Regions:
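C-terminal motif of bacterial Sec signal peptides marking the signal peptidase cleavage site
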Residues: 15-18
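Disordered inhibitory propeptide/activation segment of secreted metzincin zinc metalloprotease zymogens
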Residues: 22-112, 230-242
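Acidic helix-start/capping segments at beta-turn-to-alpha-helix junctions
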Residues: 102-104, 134-154
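Zn2+-dependent metallopeptidase catalytic core
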Residues: 111-134
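Catalytic zinc-binding patch centered on the HExxH motif and its immediate surroundings
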Residues: 113, 145-173
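Surface-exposed patches in mature extracellular/periplasmic domains of secreted proteins
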Residues: 127-141, 208-215
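Short pre-active-site segment immediately N-terminal to the catalytic Zn-binding motif
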Residues: 177-197
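The catalytic-center signature of Zn2+-dependent metalloproteases
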Residues: 190, 195-265
Length: 275
């Protein structure tokens, strides 16, 4: 996922998970083949700010596709009940009970990232789901690999590889920004854990809580404010908030930079999917 600092009239500051490019490139798709843009549109993705990167394309700020993987995306159902509820993708993790192995391969700050990863694992495992998590020491063992790459400045923190595959495997890797100064020895462990837990949520099938109206958590209307189906499905999870806002959800599109452990609706959603 992509996260940025945004300011509006110097009144607020938030960090955005996904879907917002640097101003200079947010509307430029000149380098993207028209065939790719047409396929994105046909499968429900926004073409705002599509970015050509090594080996493929970054779409909606948080999804990476090669041309081949894009062609395999199937259009899923889009069931919207309200504006701020928990939603899942069409594909979920299968073969339960299952242990998802996570490796921290971030190139620096090993103690910080190991501690944050362990906190993420503890958060999920505390719920007693049939989907559990375990940290492993090598990428070869891992189902989800956390890596570092220079994603530029401007407050960009990271990007995930999307959502579960058609055969029920989690998306990998989660890429966090390794540009100098993005993360430091003084970075709060629990805040970093919230960032990683959010990305892990996507890899196991969680959409943004406010995917249909990101203005709710971001405070301003962004390009592609309603993320739509995005070719992966946006299915309401029964039992979660269907009539009022859910300000503390770990899957909101924007965060204020504080720790967000699972709130009651988050727990309901995860239990519905994986208990």
């Amino acid at each position: 996922m992509k996260m940025k600092f945004l300011t509006a009239a110097a009144v607020f500051s938030v960090m955005l998970y996904s879907c917002k490019k640097d101003t200079a490139s947010s509307n430029s798709t000149a380098s993207i083949p028209q065939s790719i843009l047409n396929e994105l549109t046909a499968k429900g993705f926004s073409t705002d700010g599509v970015q050509a990167v090594d080996g493929g394309y970054v779409v909606e700020g948080d999804l990476f596709f090669t041309a081949e993987s894009l062609s395999s995306v199937k259009v899923g159902p889009n069931l919207v009940v309200g504006q701020e509820e928990q939603y899942r993708t069409t594909n979920l993790i299968t073969g339960l009970p299952k242990v998802i192995k996570i490796c921290n391969s971030y190139p620096t700050l090993l103690p910080l990232f190991n501690a944050a990863t362990d906190s993420v694992i503890a958060r999920y495992n505390k719920l007693g789901l049939r989907l559990t998590f375990q940290r492993v020491s090598t990428a070869a063992e891992a189902d989800i690999n956390i890596i570092g790459d220079d994603l530029g400045g401007g407050g960009v923190l990271g990007r995930s590889s999307g959502f579960p595959s058609a055969d029920g495997k989690p998306a990998s890797p989660i890429t966090l920004n390794s540009r100098k100064g993005t993360f430091t020895k003084t970075t709060n462990v629990q805040w970093l854990a919230t960032v990683i837990a959010h990305e892990v949520g996507h890899t196991i099938g969680m959409r943004h809580t406010d995917y249909a109206n990101r203005k709710y958590s971001c405070g301003i209307r962004l390009p592609g404010n309603n993320e739509g189906d995005s070719g992966v499905g946006a299915i309401f999870i029964p039992g979660t908030n269907s009539s009022y806002a859910d300000p503390g959800s770990w899957m909101l599109a924007c965060t204020d930079g504080t720790n967000r452990p699972f709130n009651p609706n988050d727990v309901i959603a995860l239990n519905y999917l994986y208990h």
